[in-house]
């Protein structure tokens, strides 16, 4: 008879450990599908693995679903990622991340759809305000400590929008402007901030 696990019992267990396969086998096919396909802004509770419901909120400069008034909670709008990167100070990024994490705890938010780690490829980029810099190393350093601060307070960061995503019009329909770049450029520049956010900051998710 297979051992039954709760998701809390596997906290900190290596991703490659076979116990994860045993945990997943406790889900029905519908539960497994729903966990992926119905995961916008949170995930449902699953009793068979004692998984609680989670709540995620959007906004690289704070939880904007509160700022824009979709509920009655109050929230802080922090300086944009670009402004934070212009300080060239990883500790400021870390402090902002901590503040976002503390606020997330107060609002009972588990995950943060941010920060944004794409590069400023063009001054006309539709989401430049969400991203740090045109330099991959600077963006990666600031992003990593932004993420680390939030994570240390218990809020998981979902870094976005991977990768080379700087055209807003038609971006989800496949009708936007195409980008041309070499694999070397993609790896050394555009993916560098995401790599650093994971390796240095401990980011748990990508968008």
Per-region residue spans from a language model:
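Glycoside hydrolase catalytic-domain context in secreted enzymes
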Residues: 1-207
